[in-house]
Amino acid sequence: MTEDPKQIAQETESLRKVAFFGIAVSTIATLTAIIAVPMLYNYMQHVQSSLQSEVEFCQHRSNGLWDEYKRFQGVSGVEGRIKRDAYHRSLGVSGASRKARRQSYGNDAAVGGFGGSSGGSCCSCGSGAAGPAGSPGQDGAPGNDGAPGAPGNPGQDASEDQTAGPDSFCFDCPAGPPGPSGAPGQKGPSGAPGAPGQSGGAALPGPPGPAGPPGPAGQPGSNGNAGAPGAPGQVVDVPGTPGPAGPPGSPGPAGAPGQPGQAGSSQPGGPGPQGDAGAPGAPGAPGQAGAPGQDGESGSEGACDHCPPPRTAPGY
């Protein structure tokens, strides 16, 4: 039983849409997780640092109020109940640190003095000092031209008896560029005929002309008288010119072998001139990795001088 090709094509198209939708949703979810998770982690860390700073500040305030209460109790002579340590134990604050804070409570201290600046501890403000200033950035693109300014106020009127001269103006007006050529005008009327010119006088004779072509041949003349008889002729033998070379003859028999020649006495020649430079060789193999360098010196411990002063109530 064969299936309908149209039905198969429809199912393929529907499955293609479902696959495309699934891939798009998974891609968007992945990108959202990549961007949202670090942002959420950073926000939670910021909130934790802020809450830790606020909790330490509230703890500092409560310790101050408790010291005031103890001082008032000592002055009035009324014995009160013992302060519980559950709150401080939950925050990791020991009695020695409370005693140290109570002894130094009378002086005004910044937040950095409360949290301590010993090695391995964090400042109460939850952030480090500002780093060094970075290098200046590149110059930006030039901005657009500004709008034209408003026209200036009119000048004072000149007096009636004052005349404008070349020295009256305080600015130099250069000559403007020449204007375009105007349209050609209409043709003017014909001028009056001029006066007759002076006569040239008698002309000088010119040079002789070139020779003319030769004339036609004349009529042949009449026969002349018969001449005297000549001397008898002589027979002279003259050698003829040599004829062309004949064909080459057949080769003759081979001759006897000659005597062996003497050994040569020539010296070997000197070295020839230096040849051209060869092609550059292939790059060498990379060298072995160097040994790791020594560890650097430990950096200075951070201080809490950059933290803002505590937000205490008036009178503290």
Swiss-Prot record:
Matching SMART domains: Col_cuticle_N
Q: Where is the composition biased (Low complexity)?
A: 127-157, 183-204, 219-234, 256-266, 276-295
Which UniProt keywords are present, listed alphabetically? Collagen, Cuticle, Disulfide bond, Repeat, Signal
Q: Name one GO molecular function term.
A: structural constituent of cuticle
Subunit info here reads: Collagen polypeptide chains are complexed within the cuticle by disulfide bonds and other types of covalent cross-links.
Which family, according to the similarity comment? Belongs to the cuticular collagen family.
Q: What is this protein called?
A: Cuticle collagen 12
